[in-house]
């Protein structure tokens, strides 16, 4: 038989495929069960039997799975186990664990109570003590001043540029509140007592057994015991002590507070210990802005005696003189703008000194000349200006650009001292490393010793100090004479250290000794 006839006869005997594969096997056996009849497909490797067997196997698996699902549907549903809520990694972990019954309600409540008990001593997040940071903290007096207006003050020059002037933030008030200044930013209120020099005093006669808490109470009592004090007002700010020379740098809240203590001259601190109050070096006289002047009343009794270059201090007044009698002494010299006689709040007796200000500034010098040394009821009066130091010139606000020009031309009146302060030389992170701190110290010492003999160098660090962060990033150098400090300032202007242009300025020696940065 030829090949074509075999294929035709064999194919005619192949049973037709049925939709239901369960009947496939019997039909195939009946069609191929004859004697001498062979399935011609077996000789030529047909894939149909293999495919059929694979389909039957898949069907059996499908049928068994379906029957299983039927049986599971008839089975009663089990309760959800407690560990079904556990993460998948725990439920299917290879680590064996013992099956335990689901916890009871009492057990859950008890465990929650134990957890709450452990949290009783935890400090609430709103009471956490945050680490002191100087980021986004503006200098005193500049809290409501924009960066553009602060730059115009001349206090913050660009690195390498000479400092335009020693000035207070109130110097900006005329420009900031003018029409020209409002173009840059809305006019913010400036604090007249921003200068730290105006709020600091040198307190001499500090005892060796100095206790800060007792000193703070003593200072506050000096205010509270007099009519100068206003209710619910705190006056003390900070103190830095130089025990080697028995003095301290006291900082109070306002310039008027500092002038009040200065007017006391000296006070008994303890047995045979008297403290004296003096102005610091480079004291800056505060200004009274035109806006503040316009708000003052024509009645001198309603105005506070603000610190200014025209404020007068009169001491050694007879203790039996009242306010009206002292005012009568002052009226011949001009109309008063403000007046305050300091009295004891306990009995109303006079402390023997007063502050005043005339409406016409020229009357102040006339009054001082007429009152100083005058005999009054057996006492020789002493009259002088209360605020004597570096004065700041008021700037005309007629033209905005003219104001900027005047600020740029303003010359520094800083008094030369033996101490130089260096800005932009180091960062706080650099001096945290001990080795790097020593390297910077030696580098500064080597460079600045070229201009004269050095006494010492101070690089403030915030490690373990009470005033954390104050002075960090600055370097202070003290020479044996003022001339060497002046030469060093001229020679080192604009120099760079570690690719940073340093800025140099004089610093008060009294604050340097007391570490009052």
UniProtKB/Swiss-Prot annotation:
Disulfide topology: none
Biased composition range(s): Low complexity: 1-13
One Gene Ontology cellular component: U2AF complex
Keywords for the protein's UniProt record, in alphabetical order: mRNA processing, mRNA splicing, Nucleus, Repeat, RNA-binding
Top-rank taxon: Eukaryota
Location of the region described as Disordered in the Swiss-Prot/TrEMBL record: 1-112
Bias kind Basic and acidic residues: ranges: 20-89
Family according to the record: Belongs to the splicing factor SR family.
NCBIfam families: U2AF_lg
Protein name: Splicing factor U2AF 59 kDa subunit
Taxon lineage: Eukaryota, Fungi, Dikarya, Ascomycota, Taphrinomycotina
